[in-house]
Structures are given as structure tokens and as C-alpha cells.
């Protein structure tokens, strides 16, 4: 199965908020050991390279260009491309973006907000997002911490306004919509057949459309379908040929990978061998055809029949 890209919101916020945090032991009553004296950002860096958590962007290089580089250096198969990437990581010629989040090549550029009020709502420490993500007024009162990171590269001057484009799917003019460059009018709860939940309680709401979406609003499915269609059209000009992409996936629960690390040994520091899927994240080569993004979005892929479906270590056939 093709691994899905994953990202945790908490680490997205840590792209800039870590500058205002100190050492664990400074604000928590914890025993003195190598874990409690770490900085949060350093721990996140370790968790990514050891395969505990995902992070995007992955590296300081474009992964499409990275696979081309591997092929230009003699890699002919997917396994050889994986080995090329692995060797670059081991030699530290290829760097993790999480290890230097302030570097310009590691900045996220496009932010889609969907089903959440990320700015001033879901995101904790929103003043830091306003300052560093959007480059706008922030009412920030905190100053940079004197406890600098040890592994994550520290920049004395933090960049502001990392994002080039913020797009919000919304039916309310909340704070995220107010700060977005583009607001796509989304259908509200009773204008679509869907599942919905909130952060107020654990209930899942199965909703049925009472009326059709009003005015220019569209269902989430139709909005993403149009985005996929136009992306495919643009891809015919800029990414007309099939591409090979590199995807790093964390070790997942309910799989063999969750029991591969009995002890915490960091391959990045030479404490053990770097073995994808065991001592570190998995490395997968994925074939992508961006010109067919729309066709794939509206179709049921043939991998369903070949590989089946499943979750949490279970798999079932779909003949």
C-alpha cells in the first residue's frame, strides 16, 4: 500500500514556538536524567529521525529532485533510490527539515485550513503563529528563551511571515477566515451528507443534507475535487512526466514496527545501525502522476483489489 503523508499539529506549532520554551526541568518537577534536560524541539527532532513521529517538510531538499539526483547517480530501482537517500542521511549530507525549521528552504509555503479554526482557535500559542507564520501583528509579550536548543539549529533572528498563501474552507467568518488570503465557501452542517465532530465533546454526528449548498458554497468533496482538477491541468505544463517521490513514514502501532526498538538507541548519534523500519522511519519510493490527480481522486483505485483494505494491523480482501 502507498503510505499516506502524516503530520501532527503540535509539531507544526513547534516550528517557531520552541524559541520561547526552556528546558523541561526548568518548569516541571522531574527526575534528573538525560530525558528531562532536553529541549522540546530537540526531543521532537529525535522522535522524527527515530521514526516515532512524522514531520513535513521532510528534508532540506525537494523530494522529487532528490529521487532524480539518485537516478543521475546510478540508482535504477526503487530499492537503489531508497539506499541512496539512506546513505545521504547517514553521512548527514541530507538534513531533516525539523532540525533547522528556521532555514528558508524548510519553511512551509501553502497552508490549507479545513474543519478547524486553526488561527486563534485550535492552535495554542497563536501569537507566535501570527508573528512567524503570517508576519502580522501578534501581541507577543514573550522573549526568546536563554535555554537554546542543542541539536536543532538556533538562529538568533527568527524569520517572520513564512507562509506565502493561506486558504481556508469555511462557512463562518472566524479568525482563521479573517487572516486567510482565500476563503472558499463551504457547505454548512445540514447542506451535506457527512460526519462531523467538535472539540467540545466526543460525539460523532452523522449528518444528512436538509437543503442543497446555498449561493456559491460547495461540499468539502466538491471543493477538493475542483482543486484536484485544476492542479492536474497545471501539472500538464509543469510536471507532465510521472515523478518518483520519497515518503518517510513513522513506525506505526499494531504493526511489527512498534516492537523493533526495545531500547532507545539513536542511529543519528552512532548508537546503532540506521535500519529503515526498525531503528528509524521507513523510506518509501512512491510513483506520482500529477496530471492524473483528478482522475484518481474521483476513481476507486485498482490497489483496493490487489492489496485490500485495513487498519490497526488488520487486513481484509476487497474482491
Report each predicted region and the residues it spans:
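Domain-level signature for respiratory redox metalloenzymes
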Residues: 1-168, 173-319
